[in-house]
Amino acid sequence: YKLLVNLGINSITAIGHQPAKILKSAHMKEICRSILNDGLQVAQSEGIHFPDQTLDDIMKIYQGYPDEMGTSMYYDVLNQQPLEVEAIQGYIYQKARFHKLNTPYLDTVYTFLKAYHLKFTRN
């Protein structure tokens, strides 16, 4: 569950370069829901079944965050630091590939965050 919570908010705040207030935008909120939906699809394929209201529950958690609350990935981007992309988005992305799932939002955020992260490695 925590990995899903981190998947949505960390992806949006890091790519959008904004703290939690980024979810005040209806468009960003919908993108976040789509990222979470991809994550839920992966979890289900892994045999992890969440209640139907899980996506709404996670979005309610985000609504409770203060506008200026940043995530670890947001602060990593802000401070020009490497990201924990493989531990969050990368892990879920690899599971999606294993199950041959169509996860376009997850694929996109993983690709962008991985590209940012690669500037800190020699590979």
What is each of the regions a protein language model found here?
Residues 1-40, 66-67:
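Active-site-proximal catalytic alpha-helix in oxidoreductases
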Residues 33-123:
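NAD(P)-dependent Rossmann-like dehydrogenase/reductase catalytic/cofactor-binding core
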